[in-house]
Amino acid sequence: MRVAIMNKFYFILLTICFLGCSEESIPQDLPSSNSHPLESNSIPRNPLKNVYFGDTHVHTDLSFDAFLFGTRRTPDDAYYFGKGQKVKHAYGFNMQIKKPLDFMAVSDHAYYLGVLRHLSKSTSGDHTKFSKLLRETKTADDVFEVLAQTMRYLNQPSDKTIFDNKDVVRSSWQEVIDAAERHNQPGKFTTFIAYEYTSGSVFSGPNPDNLHRNVIYRSSSVPIEPYSRLDSRNPENLWSWMDKKRAEGMDSLAIPHNMNRSNGKMFKTTKWDDSRIDAQWAEQRLRNEPIVENSQVKGTSDTHPLLSPNDEWADFEILPSANERDLNGSYVRQALIKGLVMKEKLGFNPYQFGVIAASDTHNAAGSFGEANYWSKTGLLDNPAHRRGSVPLPEPAEEGSVYSDDASRYWGSLRVSWRLGRVKH
């Protein structure tokens, strides 16, 4: 495993070139999961490796929360931003990155994907007033009002709400797919079809447990709709679904994030039902989650001062509200140690993963520069004092990968894949 540490201070951005493959170790004729030719075949390779930068955690107006925040930028807008073009913030100013990214994934919430945008266009029915609120959201106060109305709908005793619309979810998922396909430029700008699985055993209240994952597809062979918390809140069921789809030629990996907000549940030493972890469970987790997102706008999940008392940088970018949650099982360094102990005592290690950083922007555009920091939450980003500050002169600018050609990012993230995105 080759690890690239890409920051001046302490935390790791995206590091992984699993197995750091030499040319001799890569079978050039290895078939892909859906038997399509590799996009990297015609792309020059650098035997000394290259460093690539990208963002695998981007939300657009298809995410229910981003739309509530007033974001009206689409997946296409997100990819335009990634390629260096200007896009508009919800408050009307331009957002633009200094240098184009090399790879990117729009990863909107599968949970009610596109439904809020769809409802905003409705002019009839029992929810007309709510639809009007969505359309007329212009200020931070409007956001708080529409959030309150949304929670009233979500907290209804009925299993069915105005948000349950599979047709809209499927058409929105197709929009995600189409945008990734339009903007994919092998060797120049690689896009991945993706979504966020937004789950937790406790979803509301003062201390919800964040068990969210971004699911990233290797190719354009993808299911007709994403798997969401409406299917199951148990991540183990997500892994089983991924295994099933992988057997059908739809290969993917999941990237957990915000372990710091998981209330100790992301890196437990037991299963979802609190039964004992076994080797089969460890293998399934590793197969589906070879990498975790340990730094983003909602703080670092690397470590905590109470877990690393001898590390003077352990308090860097700690999310204040995370201090109110259970630290044990919520941070990466501790999980790596737990995994080594489990390997020694039990013979298996479910936590031998790599790390990545990403933006988690809900503006369709990651904000990476201190001098022009626009934050992540649409209309809630203004006025400027709402955005707070970032202590680094150049805060975490997505992830970095060592690889030898520009479409092999996937293989650099995936312990068992070394061949990048494949053609459809």
Which residues are covered by each model-predicted region?
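Sec-dependent signal peptide recognition
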Residues: 6-14
